[in-house]
Amino acid sequence: MEARQQRQQALADSRRALMLDAARSVFERLGIEGASIREIAKQAGYTPGAIYSYFENKEAIYGALLAESLERLNAVVDAAGTGINETASPAALLEAKASAWFGFYAANPRDLDLGFYLVQGMQPRGLTATLNNQLNDRLHDALKPCEAALQAMGLNGQDALRENTSLFAHGVGLLLMQHTGRIRMFGQDATQLFDAYVIELIERLRGRG
């Protein structure tokens, strides 16, 4: 009985993954508002009824995709800096953690679309307030290590939050320019510019002392 249940669960997981892959393709092409369960089912090779047996609506599918993306983001950030010994400076940890989340989105532009709702003009349309808050919390979890490092460098909580917000905003702006190709008109590299911003931030904070 247990082996049978395991096979059934494996089959269900496989179907769910296939549906999510199909939905990702549809959302990239049509956006969350333009997509439909019928279109997702067609892309996946299932009936709409089969999709509904796994997901309540298209927003739930979108939320599942974004949640999975954010879990991968957090895993990358958590792993960053593992080679840094316990006596390393907070500045080194800040560099590692900031480079981790920026690098994740630089290497995965489709996750950038999901994470920042670029398919709908960067507005979280279609998601319930509860789901949107839950997803925002997971995004914030990936950014908290930078905030903690800033506090370890001597900033109070409010100042650390402000600097971390500026760091994130700067990074997202560069990612957007890279993602759209606009950065090429300046002949610049997004990663190099972000790294320079982090170094300048660290030097500025050191100068406060």
Give a label for each model feature.
Residues R15-A23, I40, L65-V77:
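Generic hydrophobic, amphipathic alpha-helix propensity
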Residues A64, D78-R110, G157, E163-L167:
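Hydrophobic alpha-helical connector segments
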Residues V77-D78, A92, L114, R125-G154, ...:
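Amphipathic alpha-helical packing segments from all-alpha helical-bundle domains
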Residues L18, V26-A60, A64:
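Helix-turn-helix
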Residues M1-S14, G209:
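N-terminal intrinsically disordered/low-complexity leader segments
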Residues R29-E33, N108, M153:
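Short coil/turn segments at alpha/beta junctions that flank glycine-rich nucleotide-binding fingerprints
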Residues A106-L127, L176-R184:
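Amphipathic alpha-helical segments used for helix-helix packing
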Residues G103-A107, A148, T165-F186, L201-G209:
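Amphipathic C-terminal alpha-helical segment
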